[in-house]
Amino acid sequence: ADNHARVAGPRAVASGRYATEKAFLQMMTRGSCGLPCHENRRCGWACYCDDGICKPLRV
């Protein structure tokens, strides 16, 4: 198992995992718009990389 999980305890791990998933979901939607982007860091599906900044796609 993971050493960090044993140290933090199951409740902390669960809340940490929830926060990570929530952040990931925000990143995958419009949450990533406005963030810097480059070749290795792409924007979420609702955004595109324009001049180094994630901008919302016009639908």
Swiss-Prot record:
Keywords: Disulfide bond, Neurotoxin, Secreted, Toxin. Its main location: secreted. It is found in: Secreted. One of its GO terms (molecular function) is toxin activity. The keyword Disulfide bond applies. Negative results: has no activity on N-methyl-D-aspartate (NMDA) receptors. This is Crassipeptide cce9a. It comes from Crassispira cerithina (Sea snail).
